[in-house]
């Protein structure tokens, strides 16, 4: 399935009251898309889904990719305006579609966990649920990537921005910059952007589950149709 079709399917309503999902159209689509994908639903909370490849030992997962599914739009839509542009309500279906595209194409390492969370627009209760799940699994992931859509890169005409980096060592930081430069995709760094799930993941949930080094690779809201999911 092409990214464009995934984007259309996932740009549907999903809302919560801070305790549980009240509109679950996008949740249903995610479950349907991943049903025969080789990924297993490892955990489901009132505000979260956690997927991963089946592993003999749960503590062998190394990376968490988190993409929130709650939206603030009254009416969700996705429309192909022309060959270059899409028009629609893409916060945060754009990155939901991007990570699911990578999952379906087998582009993620088997050590990667993928979380879909609610309540990101307010208190990040979905991210807190994910941290609790990781604690029960005794899973100490080494880093988290939080995907979102903002307008931080708009003035710089960047394809995406790197926001709210927490806890990454300088060697990892240089490595990320090298990879970005090699990709040719333009980006900007915003070290202290609006609060997002990185603030919860970086705090940890207990002494047994310390904070996770994390950052947010963020697409800006003017999504161009010719960009591939790797740019998001």
Tell me the role of every PLM-derived stretch:
Residues 36-44, 84, 185-191:
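Short secondary-structure junctions
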Residues 9-59:
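A non-catalytic alpha/beta surface segment that caps or lines the substrate-entry region
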Residues 67-72, 147-151, 220:
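Short glycine-enriched loops at secondary-structure junctions
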Residues 88-181, 185-207:
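Acidic/histidine-rich catalytic neighborhood of metal-dependent amide-processing enzymes
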Residues 221-230:
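Conserved small/polar residues in nucleotide/adenosyl-binding loops
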Residues 33, 43, 59-116:
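Active-site metal-coordination/substrate-binding segment of hydrolases
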Residues 41, 114, 144-146, 212-216:
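Conserved beta-strand scaffold positions in the cores of enzyme catalytic domains, especially
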């Amino acid at each position: 399935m092409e990214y464009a079709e995934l984007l259309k399917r996932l740009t549907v309503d999903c809302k919560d009251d801070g305790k549980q999902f009240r509109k679950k159209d996008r949740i249903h689509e995610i479950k349907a898309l991943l049903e025969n994908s080789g990924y297993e639903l490892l955990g489901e909370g009132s505000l979260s889904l956690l997927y991963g490849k089946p592993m003999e030992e749960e503590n062998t997962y190394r990376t968490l990719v988190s993409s929130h599914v709650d939206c603030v739009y009254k009416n969700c839509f996705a429309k192909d305006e022309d060959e270059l542009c899409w028009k629609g309500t893409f916060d945060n279906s754009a990155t939901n579609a991007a990570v699911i595209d990578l999952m379906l194409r087998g582009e993620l390492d088997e050590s990667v966990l993928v979380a879909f969370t609610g309540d990101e627009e307010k208190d990040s209760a979905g991210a807190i649920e994910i941290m609790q799940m990781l604690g029960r699994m005794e899973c100490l992931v080494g880093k988290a990537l939080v995907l979102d859509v903002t307008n931080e890169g708009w003035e710089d005409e960047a394809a995406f921005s790197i926001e709210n980096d927490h806890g990454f060592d300088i060697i990892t930081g240089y490595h990320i910059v090298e990879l970005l430069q090699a990709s040719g995709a333009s980006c900007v760094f915003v070290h202290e952007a609006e609060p997002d799930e990185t603030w919860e993941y970086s705090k940890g949930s207990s002494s047994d589950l310390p904070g996770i080094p994390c950052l947010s690779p963020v697409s800006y809201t003017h999504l161009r149709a010719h960009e591939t999911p790797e740019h998001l």
